């Protein structure tokens, strides 16, 4: 779990900007990673159409295993993360920050548990859970109670944000815990990211051996593949014979709903593509928004398949 973490932090804590953020592709499009200009133009037009039909604001980023931005829509605009931050929190825990080990115990206070927390509630009788089980369940079932317990262990939202800064991401920020982080107030930068920044940070955590060692990267990927919350969103548009995982997010505040999903997929064993889908204030949530996510997944898959 510890691996190269000390060297990683020493190398990256150099003004927080050592790793360049991917830029938002601008018009006119250029060929990217063997994908034709025409294919990119068609994909962009499809995203514009999806946004119009949604009645809300759509953020998308598709990044290849090497970090090339293949597609984006509102890629540098801020969106609430909702529960998608939990993948980064799990990655931070796997890095062994603050000496955390998977078998360490976290004490549960039932009175402090809010919202969706199926695993935490299943542990009320025992009164504790392990760090490893908490990290697994914040990804696979998006457990809020486990997320808050882990935040307590890593220095709170500020601690996670500082870890993200050390990855070279100066955009993504977590300011509050569950459930407050889901407020999604208009113009409020708290608990937000951009599709491009988030996609690149996701990619690094899942692919860069200076962040996590191979065993921990594989563990995090397996949790994402096992996730149960996003089967009808991005995954529904990605071919079933590709390896795919995802982490969803849902901000449910009245008048400020956001439907999110961040997927990783590997068509042929060549590494993880990262696909970010943020849908802010759509006219409907539920199956309607999920179906739009599936369309975005299909657009991304078609684009990757079109590469020469």
Where are these regions (language model features)?
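C-terminal motif of bacterial Sec signal peptides marking the signal peptidase cleavage site
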Residues: 15-17
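Structured C-terminal helix/loop/strand segments within mature extracytoplasmic catalytic/sensor domains
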Residues: 19-50, 66, 70, 153, ...
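Short, conserved catalytic-motif segment at the N-terminal edge
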Residues: 56-78
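Mid-domain, small-residue-enriched loop/turn segments at the edges of structured enzyme/sensor domains
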Residues: 57-58, 135, 148-207
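Acidic helix-start/capping segments at beta-turn-to-alpha-helix junctions
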Residues: 65, 103-121, 154-155, 181, ...
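Active-site SXXK
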Residues: 68, 80-108, 138, 275
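Short, well-structured active-site flanking segments
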Residues: 95-113, 157, 161, 213-216
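Conserved catalytic neighborhood of penicillin-recognizing serine enzymes
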Residues: 113-150, 157
């Amino acid at each position: 779990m510890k691996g190269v973490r000390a060297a990683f932090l020493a190398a990256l804590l150099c003004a927080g900007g050592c790793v360049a953020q991917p830029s938002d592709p601008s018009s006119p499009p250029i060929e990217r990673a063997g994908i034709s200009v025409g294919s990119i133009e068609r994909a962009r037009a499809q995203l514009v159409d999806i946004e119009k039909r949604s009645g809300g604001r759509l953020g998308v980023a598709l990044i290849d295993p090497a970090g090339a931005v293949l597609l984006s829509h509102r890629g540098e605009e801020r969106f609430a993360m909702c529960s998608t931050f939990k993948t980064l929190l799990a990655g931070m825990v796997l890095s062994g920050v603050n000496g955390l080990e998977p078998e360490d115990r976290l004490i549960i206070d039932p009175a402090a548990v809010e919202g969706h927390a199926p695993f935490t509630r299943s542990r009320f009788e025992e009164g504790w859970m392990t760090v490893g089980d908490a990290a697994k369940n914040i990804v696979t079932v998006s457990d809020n109670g486990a997320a808050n317990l882990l935040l307590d262990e890593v220095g709170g939202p500020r601690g996670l944000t500082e870890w993200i800064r050390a990855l070279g991401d100066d955009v993504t920020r977590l300011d509050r815990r569950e459930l407050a982080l889901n407020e999604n107030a208009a113009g409020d930068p708290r608990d937000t990211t951009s599709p491009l920044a988030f996609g690149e940070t996701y990619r690094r955590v899942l692919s860069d051996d200076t962040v996590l060692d191979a065993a921990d990267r594989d563990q995090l990927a397996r949790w994402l593949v096992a996730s149960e919350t996003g089967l009808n969103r991005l995954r529904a548009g990605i071919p079933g014979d590709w390896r795919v995982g995802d982490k969803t997010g849902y901000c449910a505040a009245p008048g400020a709903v956001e439907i999110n999903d961040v997927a990783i997929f590997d068509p042929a064993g060549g590494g993880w593509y990262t696909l970010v889908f943020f849908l802010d204030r759509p006219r409907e949530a539920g199956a309607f928004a999920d179906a739009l996510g599936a369309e975005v997944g299909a657009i991304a898959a078609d684009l990757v398949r079109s590469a020469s």
